Regions:
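Short, solvent-exposed loop/beta-turn-alpha elements that line the ligand-binding surface or hinge
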Residues: 29, 111-133, 208, 225-245, ...
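Extracytoplasmic/periplasmic solute-binding protein
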Residues: 138-159, 164, 185-235, 278
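Long, aromatic- and glycine/proline-rich binding clefts that accommodate carbohydrate-like moieties
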Residues: 31, 303-307, 353-406, 410, ...
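Short, polar/charged alpha-helical segment
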Residues: 25-26, 42-63, 404, 422
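Glycine-centered hinge/linker elements that transmit conformational signals in sensory
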Residues: 189-195, 232-262, 304, 308
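Short, well-ordered beta-strand elements
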Residues: 31-42, 61-66, 89-90, 155
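Hinge/lid segment of periplasmic solute-binding proteins
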Residues: 23-29, 98-162, 304, 372
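Extracytoplasmic "Venus flytrap"/periplasmic binding protein-like
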Residues: 50-136, 175-179, 272, 276-280, ...
Protein backbone atom coordinates (compact mmCIF):
# COMPACT_ATOMS: atom_id res chain seq x y z
CA UNK A 1 0.00 0.00 0.00
CA UNK A 2 1.41 3.36 -0.99
CA UNK A 3 1.63 6.08 1.60
CA UNK A 4 0.26 8.96 -0.44
CA UNK A 5 0.31 12.65 0.42
CA UNK A 6 -1.90 14.69 -1.85
CA UNK A 7 -0.29 17.95 -2.89
CA UNK A 8 -3.63 19.68 -2.38
CA UNK A 9 -3.41 19.13 1.37
CA UNK A 10 0.07 20.60 1.77
CA UNK A 11 0.95 24.16 2.67
CA UNK A 12 1.24 26.27 -0.45
CA UNK A 13 4.67 27.62 -1.34
CA UNK A 14 5.53 30.94 -2.91
CA UNK A 15 3.26 32.05 -5.74
CA UNK A 16 4.40 31.93 -9.34
CA UNK A 17 3.50 34.20 -12.19
CA UNK A 18 0.83 32.17 -13.92
CA UNK A 19 1.95 31.17 -17.39
CA UNK A 20 -1.02 28.98 -18.17
CA UNK A 21 -4.20 27.81 -16.54
CA UNK A 22 -5.87 24.45 -16.35
CA UNK A 23 -8.61 25.73 -18.69
CA UNK A 24 -6.37 26.75 -21.58
CA UNK A 25 -2.86 26.38 -22.91
CA UNK A 26 -0.48 23.41 -22.72
CA UNK A 27 -1.83 21.99 -19.47
CA UNK A 28 -5.49 21.82 -20.55
CA UNK A 29 -5.40 18.26 -21.96
CA UNK A 30 -4.04 16.98 -18.64
CA UNK A 31 -6.23 18.85 -16.16
CA UNK A 32 -7.82 16.39 -13.76
CA UNK A 33 -4.98 13.87 -14.13
CA UNK A 34 -3.53 12.50 -10.90
CA UNK A 35 0.20 11.78 -10.96
CA UNK A 36 1.76 9.37 -8.47
CA UNK A 37 5.41 10.23 -7.78
CA UNK A 38 8.11 8.57 -5.70
CA UNK A 39 10.39 10.94 -3.77
CA UNK A 40 13.01 10.42 -1.03
CA UNK A 41 12.71 11.63 2.53
CA UNK A 42 15.32 14.35 2.09
CA UNK A 43 15.54 18.10 2.85
CA UNK A 44 15.28 19.01 -0.83
CA UNK A 45 12.10 17.03 -1.33
CA UNK A 46 10.62 18.37 1.90
CA UNK A 47 10.95 21.76 0.20
CA UNK A 48 9.32 20.37 -2.95
CA UNK A 49 6.22 19.46 -0.96
CA UNK A 50 5.75 23.14 -0.13
CA UNK A 51 5.57 24.21 -3.79
CA UNK A 52 3.62 21.33 -5.33
CA UNK A 53 0.23 22.92 -4.52
CA UNK A 54 1.14 25.79 -6.85
CA UNK A 55 1.72 23.32 -9.67
CA UNK A 56 -1.78 21.92 -9.14
CA UNK A 57 -3.25 25.42 -8.97
CA UNK A 58 -1.63 26.37 -12.29
CA UNK A 59 -2.21 23.16 -14.20
CA UNK A 60 -5.15 21.28 -12.70
CA UNK A 61 -2.88 18.23 -12.38
CA UNK A 62 -3.03 16.56 -8.96
CA UNK A 63 0.12 15.06 -7.43
CA UNK A 64 0.30 12.26 -4.88
CA UNK A 65 3.69 11.64 -3.27
CA UNK A 66 5.07 8.35 -1.97
CA UNK A 67 8.00 9.49 0.19
CA UNK A 68 10.51 6.92 1.44
CA UNK A 69 14.04 6.85 2.92
CA UNK A 70 16.27 6.95 -0.13
CA UNK A 71 17.73 3.44 0.13
CA UNK A 72 14.20 2.06 0.71
CA UNK A 73 13.07 4.15 -2.26
CA UNK A 74 15.64 2.39 -4.42
CA UNK A 75 14.32 -1.01 -3.30
CA UNK A 76 10.73 -0.02 -4.07
CA UNK A 77 11.69 1.25 -7.52
CA UNK A 78 13.61 -1.94 -8.27
CA UNK A 79 10.31 -3.78 -7.92
CA UNK A 80 7.95 -1.23 -9.50
CA UNK A 81 9.99 -0.62 -12.65
CA UNK A 82 9.89 -4.31 -13.60
CA UNK A 83 6.08 -4.49 -13.67
CA UNK A 84 3.96 -4.17 -16.81
CA UNK A 85 1.97 -1.41 -15.10
CA UNK A 86 3.95 0.48 -12.49
CA UNK A 87 2.66 2.60 -9.63
CA UNK A 88 4.73 5.68 -10.46
CA UNK A 89 4.45 8.34 -13.15
CA UNK A 90 7.61 10.18 -12.07
CA UNK A 91 10.46 9.04 -9.86
CA UNK A 92 13.36 10.64 -8.12
CA UNK A 93 16.36 8.36 -8.38
CA UNK A 94 19.70 8.24 -6.59
CA UNK A 95 22.52 9.02 -9.00
CA UNK A 96 24.03 5.54 -8.84
CA UNK A 97 20.69 4.06 -10.01
CA UNK A 98 21.05 5.75 -13.40
CA UNK A 99 23.08 3.00 -14.99
CA UNK A 100 20.80 0.22 -13.79
CA UNK A 101 17.60 1.89 -14.98
CA UNK A 102 18.98 2.92 -18.37
CA UNK A 103 20.66 -0.44 -19.03
CA UNK A 104 17.40 -2.26 -18.22
CA UNK A 105 15.40 0.16 -20.42
CA UNK A 106 13.22 1.09 -17.43
CA UNK A 107 13.15 4.89 -17.87
CA UNK A 108 12.28 7.04 -20.87
CA UNK A 109 14.81 8.79 -23.07
CA UNK A 110 13.71 12.42 -22.75
CA UNK A 111 14.37 13.41 -26.38
CA UNK A 112 10.81 12.70 -27.62
CA UNK A 113 9.39 14.91 -24.88
CA UNK A 114 11.75 17.80 -25.61
CA UNK A 115 10.92 17.46 -29.32
CA UNK A 116 7.18 17.82 -28.74
CA UNK A 117 6.12 21.49 -29.18
CA UNK A 118 2.93 20.84 -27.21
CA UNK A 119 4.96 19.84 -24.16
CA UNK A 120 8.26 21.72 -24.14
CA UNK A 121 8.36 25.21 -22.65
CA UNK A 122 10.31 27.50 -25.03
CA UNK A 123 11.57 29.43 -21.98
CA UNK A 124 12.99 26.36 -20.23
CA UNK A 125 16.64 27.38 -20.93
CA UNK A 126 18.49 24.06 -20.47
CA UNK A 127 21.87 25.81 -20.74
CA UNK A 128 21.17 27.34 -17.32
CA UNK A 129 21.12 23.88 -15.71
CA UNK A 130 24.35 23.18 -13.81
CA UNK A 131 26.30 21.18 -16.38
CA UNK A 132 28.18 18.97 -13.90
CA UNK A 133 24.88 17.91 -12.37
CA UNK A 134 23.23 17.34 -15.75
CA UNK A 135 26.12 15.18 -16.94
CA UNK A 136 26.35 13.19 -13.73
CA UNK A 137 22.64 12.69 -13.08
CA UNK A 138 20.99 12.73 -16.48
CA UNK A 139 23.24 11.56 -19.32
CA UNK A 140 24.03 7.96 -20.22
CA UNK A 141 25.50 6.20 -23.22
CA UNK A 142 28.43 8.53 -23.84
CA UNK A 143 32.02 8.29 -22.62
CA UNK A 144 32.51 5.25 -20.36
CA UNK A 145 28.80 4.61 -20.76
CA UNK A 146 27.75 7.07 -18.07
CA UNK A 147 29.23 10.42 -19.13
CA UNK A 148 28.44 12.81 -22.02
CA UNK A 149 29.83 12.13 -25.47
CA UNK A 150 28.74 11.83 -29.10
CA UNK A 151 26.63 8.75 -28.31
CA UNK A 152 25.11 10.02 -25.07
CA UNK A 153 21.41 10.64 -24.41
CA UNK A 154 19.42 12.41 -21.72
CA UNK A 155 17.36 10.19 -19.42
CA UNK A 156 16.84 12.41 -16.39
CA UNK A 157 17.10 15.92 -15.04
CA UNK A 158 19.03 16.97 -11.92
CA UNK A 159 16.74 17.74 -9.01
CA UNK A 160 18.11 17.54 -5.50
CA UNK A 161 21.65 17.22 -6.83
CA UNK A 162 24.51 17.77 -4.43
CA UNK A 163 28.16 18.56 -4.16
CA UNK A 164 30.34 18.31 -1.08
CA UNK A 165 31.45 21.29 1.00
CA UNK A 166 33.06 21.83 4.38
CA UNK A 167 31.11 23.24 7.31
CA UNK A 168 33.12 24.52 10.26
CA UNK A 169 32.55 26.09 13.65
CA UNK A 170 33.50 29.75 13.33
CA UNK A 171 33.64 30.19 17.12
CA UNK A 172 35.96 27.22 17.60
CA UNK A 173 38.24 28.27 14.76
CA UNK A 174 38.37 31.83 16.10
CA UNK A 175 39.19 30.64 19.62
CA UNK A 176 42.03 28.44 18.35
CA UNK A 177 43.27 30.96 15.78
CA UNK A 178 42.60 28.67 12.82
CA UNK A 179 41.56 29.27 9.22
CA UNK A 180 39.39 26.74 7.36
CA UNK A 181 41.52 24.18 5.56
CA UNK A 182 42.02 24.65 1.85
CA UNK A 183 44.18 21.53 1.45
CA UNK A 184 44.25 18.01 2.86
CA UNK A 185 47.45 18.38 4.85
CA UNK A 186 45.87 21.21 6.85
CA UNK A 187 42.54 19.39 7.12
CA UNK A 188 44.07 16.23 8.58
CA UNK A 189 46.25 18.24 10.94
CA UNK A 190 43.25 20.19 12.23
CA UNK A 191 41.11 17.05 12.45
CA UNK A 192 43.27 15.74 15.29
CA UNK A 193 44.72 18.99 16.67
CA UNK A 194 41.30 20.39 17.58
CA UNK A 195 40.31 17.43 19.81
CA UNK A 196 43.71 17.63 21.48
CA UNK A 197 43.15 21.31 22.25
CA UNK A 198 39.47 20.93 23.19
CA UNK A 199 38.83 17.55 24.89
CA UNK A 200 35.37 16.22 24.12
CA UNK A 201 35.24 17.96 20.75
CA UNK A 202 35.69 15.79 17.66
CA UNK A 203 37.61 17.09 14.68
CA UNK A 204 35.50 16.15 11.65
CA UNK A 205 32.09 14.47 11.76
CA UNK A 206 31.92 11.98 8.88
CA UNK A 207 29.67 9.24 7.64
CA UNK A 208 31.43 5.88 8.04
CA UNK A 209 28.83 3.15 8.71
CA UNK A 210 29.46 -0.21 7.05
CA UNK A 211 28.19 -0.47 3.49
CA UNK A 212 27.23 2.42 1.25
CA UNK A 213 28.12 5.11 3.82
CA UNK A 214 31.71 3.93 4.32
CA UNK A 215 32.16 3.67 0.56
CA UNK A 216 30.77 7.18 0.04
CA UNK A 217 33.07 8.54 2.75
CA UNK A 218 36.11 6.92 1.11
CA UNK A 219 35.18 8.35 -2.30
CA UNK A 220 34.90 11.84 -0.77
CA UNK A 221 38.68 11.73 -0.33
CA UNK A 222 39.72 9.51 -3.25
CA UNK A 223 38.96 12.03 -6.02
CA UNK A 224 40.68 15.10 -4.49
CA UNK A 225 43.70 13.01 -3.52
CA UNK A 226 44.14 12.02 -7.16
CA UNK A 227 42.63 8.55 -7.21
CA UNK A 228 40.03 6.75 -9.28
CA UNK A 229 38.31 3.40 -8.92
CA UNK A 230 39.35 2.51 -12.51
CA UNK A 231 41.74 3.74 -15.15
CA UNK A 232 40.52 4.52 -18.68
CA UNK A 233 40.58 0.84 -19.71
CA UNK A 234 38.66 -0.41 -16.64
CA UNK A 235 41.66 -1.71 -14.74
CA UNK A 236 40.97 -1.31 -11.00
CA UNK A 237 43.22 1.38 -9.52
CA UNK A 238 41.54 1.70 -6.16
CA UNK A 239 44.61 0.09 -4.55
CA UNK A 240 47.00 2.74 -5.88
CA UNK A 241 49.04 5.01 -3.64
CA UNK A 242 46.27 7.58 -4.01
CA UNK A 243 43.69 5.03 -2.87
CA UNK A 244 45.80 4.22 0.18
CA UNK A 245 46.09 7.93 0.97
CA UNK A 246 42.30 8.31 0.76
CA UNK A 247 41.71 5.40 3.13
CA UNK A 248 44.34 6.74 5.53
CA UNK A 249 42.65 10.14 5.44
CA UNK A 250 39.26 8.62 6.25
CA UNK A 251 40.70 6.56 9.10
CA UNK A 252 42.40 9.63 10.58
CA UNK A 253 39.15 11.58 10.37
CA UNK A 254 37.12 8.81 12.02
CA UNK A 255 39.73 8.11 14.72
CA UNK A 256 39.83 11.81 15.65
CA UNK A 257 36.10 12.35 15.18
CA UNK A 258 33.26 12.41 17.69
CA UNK A 259 32.45 9.30 19.69
CA UNK A 260 30.67 6.64 17.66
CA UNK A 261 31.88 7.97 14.31
CA UNK A 262 32.47 4.54 12.79
CA UNK A 263 28.72 3.84 12.90
CA UNK A 264 27.58 7.22 11.53
CA UNK A 265 25.41 7.65 8.50
CA UNK A 266 25.04 11.14 7.04
CA UNK A 267 22.21 12.09 9.41
CA UNK A 268 24.14 10.97 12.49
CA UNK A 269 27.26 12.80 11.36
CA UNK A 270 25.27 15.96 10.64
CA UNK A 271 23.56 15.71 14.02
CA UNK A 272 26.91 15.36 15.79
CA UNK A 273 28.03 18.61 14.18
CA UNK A 274 24.69 20.30 14.91
CA UNK A 275 24.93 19.32 18.57
CA UNK A 276 28.42 20.75 18.98
CA UNK A 277 30.29 17.45 19.06
CA UNK A 278 32.58 18.23 16.11
CA UNK A 279 34.35 21.27 14.73
CA UNK A 280 33.95 20.32 11.05
CA UNK A 281 31.62 18.38 8.79
CA UNK A 282 32.40 17.49 5.17
CA UNK A 283 29.36 16.33 3.28
CA UNK A 284 26.46 17.51 1.16
CA UNK A 285 25.20 21.04 0.67
CA UNK A 286 21.76 19.70 1.69
CA UNK A 287 22.46 20.07 5.42
CA UNK A 288 23.10 23.82 5.52
CA UNK A 289 19.62 25.02 6.44
CA UNK A 290 19.32 22.54 9.31
CA UNK A 291 22.47 23.85 10.98
CA UNK A 292 20.92 27.31 11.20
CA UNK A 293 17.63 26.03 12.65
CA UNK A 294 17.81 26.86 16.36
CA UNK A 295 15.12 24.31 17.16
CA UNK A 296 17.42 21.52 15.94
CA UNK A 297 20.94 22.93 16.13
CA UNK A 298 23.00 24.21 19.05
CA UNK A 299 25.56 25.75 16.68
CA UNK A 300 23.22 28.07 14.74
CA UNK A 301 24.97 31.37 14.09
CA UNK A 302 28.41 29.79 14.49
CA UNK A 303 28.68 27.88 11.22
CA UNK A 304 30.96 28.81 8.35
CA UNK A 305 31.09 27.31 4.87
CA UNK A 306 34.04 26.56 2.62
CA UNK A 307 34.82 24.55 -0.49
CA UNK A 308 35.83 20.92 -0.12
CA UNK A 309 39.60 21.02 0.59
CA UNK A 310 41.85 20.19 -2.36
CA UNK A 311 44.43 17.45 -2.50
CA UNK A 312 46.38 17.11 -5.72
CA UNK A 313 43.25 18.51 -7.36
CA UNK A 314 40.00 20.17 -6.36
CA UNK A 315 37.31 17.52 -6.90
CA UNK A 316 34.14 17.67 -4.87
CA UNK A 317 31.34 15.14 -4.94
CA UNK A 318 28.64 15.08 -7.57
CA UNK A 319 25.62 13.10 -6.51
CA UNK A 320 22.17 13.37 -5.08
CA UNK A 321 19.00 12.89 -7.04
CA UNK A 322 17.40 13.32 -10.45
CA UNK A 323 13.94 12.98 -11.96
CA UNK A 324 13.00 10.34 -14.53
CA UNK A 325 9.84 9.00 -16.16
CA UNK A 326 9.42 5.22 -15.85
CA UNK A 327 8.76 3.26 -19.04
CA UNK A 328 5.66 1.81 -17.36
CA UNK A 329 4.26 5.17 -16.24
CA UNK A 330 0.52 5.61 -16.79
CA UNK A 331 0.77 9.34 -17.54
CA UNK A 332 4.22 10.03 -19.06
CA UNK A 333 3.35 13.32 -20.78
CA UNK A 334 1.80 14.84 -17.66
CA UNK A 335 4.81 13.56 -15.71
CA UNK A 336 7.10 15.42 -18.12
CA UNK A 337 5.12 18.60 -17.52
CA UNK A 338 5.67 18.22 -13.77
CA UNK A 339 9.36 17.45 -14.27
CA UNK A 340 9.76 20.48 -16.52
CA UNK A 341 7.84 22.75 -14.12
CA UNK A 342 9.89 21.72 -11.09
CA UNK A 343 13.22 22.18 -12.88
CA UNK A 344 12.28 25.42 -14.65
CA UNK A 345 13.84 28.71 -13.55
CA UNK A 346 10.75 29.61 -11.53
CA UNK A 347 10.34 26.13 -10.07
CA UNK A 348 13.99 25.74 -9.15
CA UNK A 349 14.02 29.12 -7.40
CA UNK A 350 10.79 28.38 -5.51
CA UNK A 351 12.13 25.07 -4.22
CA UNK A 352 15.47 26.68 -3.31
CA UNK A 353 13.72 29.45 -1.36
CA UNK A 354 11.86 26.72 0.53
CA UNK A 355 15.21 25.14 1.49
CA UNK A 356 16.03 22.89 -1.49
CA UNK A 357 19.22 22.50 -3.53
CA UNK A 358 19.42 24.63 -6.70
CA UNK A 359 19.91 22.90 -10.03
CA UNK A 360 20.46 26.12 -11.99
CA UNK A 361 23.22 28.71 -12.16
CA UNK A 362 20.63 31.51 -12.18
CA UNK A 363 19.18 30.27 -8.90
CA UNK A 364 22.55 30.44 -7.16
CA UNK A 365 22.97 33.99 -8.48
CA UNK A 366 19.55 35.12 -7.24
CA UNK A 367 19.78 38.04 -4.79
CA UNK A 368 16.72 36.99 -2.79
CA UNK A 369 18.12 33.49 -2.30
CA UNK A 370 21.51 34.81 -1.18
CA UNK A 371 19.87 37.20 1.27
CA UNK A 372 17.82 34.39 2.79
CA UNK A 373 20.55 31.71 2.69
CA UNK A 374 23.98 33.40 2.86
CA UNK A 375 25.82 30.15 2.19
CA UNK A 376 24.42 30.02 -1.35
CA UNK A 377 27.26 32.05 -2.88
CA UNK A 378 29.91 29.73 -1.40
CA UNK A 379 28.05 26.67 -2.62
CA UNK A 380 27.70 28.16 -6.08
CA UNK A 381 31.46 28.72 -6.22
CA UNK A 382 32.08 25.15 -5.04
CA UNK A 383 30.31 23.83 -8.13
CA UNK A 384 33.31 24.82 -10.22
CA UNK A 385 35.11 21.84 -8.65
CA UNK A 386 32.23 19.33 -8.86
CA UNK A 387 33.60 16.18 -10.50
CA UNK A 388 31.06 14.39 -12.76
CA UNK A 389 33.35 11.32 -12.81
CA UNK A 390 33.47 11.17 -9.01
CA UNK A 391 32.32 7.53 -9.08
CA UNK A 392 31.82 5.08 -11.98
CA UNK A 393 28.07 4.87 -12.58
CA UNK A 394 28.02 1.49 -14.30
CA UNK A 395 25.60 -1.43 -13.81
CA UNK A 396 28.20 -3.31 -11.73
CA UNK A 397 28.66 -0.38 -9.35
CA UNK A 398 26.17 -1.62 -6.77
CA UNK A 399 28.26 -4.71 -6.05
CA UNK A 400 31.55 -2.80 -6.14
CA UNK A 401 30.13 -0.13 -3.85
CA UNK A 402 28.98 -2.76 -1.34
CA UNK A 403 32.42 -4.40 -1.35
CA UNK A 404 34.19 -1.08 -0.79
CA UNK A 405 31.78 -0.23 2.01
CA UNK A 406 32.07 -3.46 3.98
CA UNK A 407 35.84 -3.69 3.51
CA UNK A 408 36.41 -0.05 4.43
CA UNK A 409 34.38 -0.59 7.58
CA UNK A 410 36.84 -3.34 8.55
CA UNK A 411 39.67 -0.85 8.05
CA UNK A 412 37.93 1.63 10.35
CA UNK A 413 36.75 -0.75 13.07
CA UNK A 414 39.05 -3.78 12.94
CA UNK A 415 42.33 -2.15 11.83
CA UNK A 416 42.49 -4.25 8.67
CA UNK A 417 45.68 -3.31 6.81
CA UNK A 418 44.76 -0.65 4.25
CA UNK A 419 46.90 -1.93 1.37
CA UNK A 420 45.68 -5.47 1.96
CA UNK A 421 42.08 -4.27 2.06
CA UNK A 422 42.34 -2.30 -1.17
CA UNK A 423 44.24 -5.08 -2.95
CA UNK A 424 41.38 -7.41 -2.08
CA UNK A 425 38.78 -5.00 -3.45
CA UNK A 426 40.80 -4.55 -6.65
CA UNK A 427 41.12 -8.31 -7.14
CA UNK A 428 37.41 -8.95 -6.60
CA UNK A 429 36.50 -5.99 -8.79
CA UNK A 430 38.65 -7.28 -11.65
CA UNK A 431 36.92 -10.66 -11.42
CA UNK A 432 33.52 -8.96 -11.51
CA UNK A 433 34.48 -6.76 -14.46
CA UNK A 434 35.71 -9.86 -16.32
CA UNK A 435 32.35 -11.51 -15.65
CA UNK A 436 30.55 -8.39 -16.91
CA UNK A 437 32.50 -8.41 -20.20
CA UNK A 438 34.62 -5.28 -19.77
CA UNK A 439 37.83 -6.94 -21.01
CA UNK A 440 36.42 -8.98 -23.89
CA UNK A 441 37.74 -6.51 -26.50
CA UNK A 442 41.22 -6.33 -25.01
Amino acid sequence: MLKLLSSTTMVAGMAFATVATAQEGPYAPYAGTTLVVNFPAHPHYNAVLEVLPEFTAQTGIEVEVDMLPYLDMRERQTLELTLDEGAYDLISYVVFSKADYVFADQIHNLAPFFMNPRLVDPNYDPEDLIDGYLQNIGVAGGEKGYLPGPTGSLFGLPFGSETSVMYYRTDVFEELGLEPAQDYATLLDQACAIPAAMPGMGGVASRAASGHQASHAFLLHLAPLGGRVFDDTWNPTINSAEGVAAAEALKTIVDCGPEGSSAFGPSEAANAFAQGQAAMFIDSIAFAAGFEDESRSTVAGNVGWASHPAGVRAASQTGGFGLAIPRNAEHPEAAFLLMQWLTSKQGDLAVALAGGNPSRFSTYANAELNAKFPWSATFGEALADADPDWRPIIPAWGRINADIGTTMSQVLTEDLDIQEALDGIAERTRALMTEEGYYIWQ
